[in-house]
A protein has these predicted regions:
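A short beta-strand submotif of the Rossmann-like class I SAM-dependent methyltransferase core
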Residues: 54-57, 83, 131-134
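Conserved PLP-binding active-site segment in aminotransferase class I/II-type PLP enzymes
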Residues: 1-76, 98
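Conserved PLP-anchoring active-site segment centered on the Schiff-base-forming lysine
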Residues: 67-123
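Residues that form or flank phosphate/diphosphate-binding pockets in enzymes
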Residues: 15, 34, 90, 114, ...
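Alpha-helical structural signal in soluble globular domains
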Residues: 42, 52, 94, 98, ...
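A structural micro-motif
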Residues: 50, 79, 100, 152-154
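Active-site phosphate-binding strand-loop segment of PLP-dependent enzymes
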Residues: 110-154
């Protein structure tokens, strides 16, 4: 018996398509417009924060996050950051783009989080890690206990 499970389907209605077409034809500005500002303000209010910044993608969000951490904690070019060896390039690129040095750790096959033996070996060579960029791979929450154990200050 054959089964057919579609991987996607039509989720945008005809009315939504027409609304989008009207919007595209009504302006030449598609980013950082008044609707984005209004949404940022409402989002900030809901979060209880002073500011929010909307970006184009998760990749850009990672870049902005690393840049903000570098500025906030006065990190210097070349400072070392723990990153998983098994991740997406968009988790590593922001480290390099911000002139920081990625130090790769292995993951545990039990939970795809940091492998304790790997973190222990890294600690022996690199005591001066400034922060850890952790990927919660495949939607599984990474166990951070090994990072906390060997780098309690980060």
């Amino acid at each position: 018996m054959k089964y057919h499970w579609p991987l996607m389907g039509e989720i945008i209605t005809e009315n939504q398509r027409m609304d989008l077409a009207k919007f595209i034809l009504s302006t030449t500005r598609y980013t950082q417009g008044p609707q984005v500002k209004e949404f940022e303000d409402q989002w900030s209010k809901w979060l209880g924060t002073k500011y929010s910044v909307f970006v184009t993608s998760g990749s850009t969000a990672n870049y902005v996050l690393v840049a903000a951490i570098k500025e906030r904690y006065n990190l210097k070019d070349g400072d070392k950051v723990l990153v998983p060896a098994n991740t997406w390039v968009t988790s590593i690129s922001p480290i390099i783009q911000n002139n920081l040095t990625p130090i790769f750790y292995d993951i545990s096959l039990d939970n795809f989080g940091p492998d304790e033996g790997s973190i222990e070996k890294i600690k022996q060579k690199h005591s001066e890690i400034k922060f850890a960029f952790v990927t919660h791979l495949l939607g599984l929450p990474a166990n951070l206990n090994s990072i906390k154990k060997y780098y309690p200050e980060i």
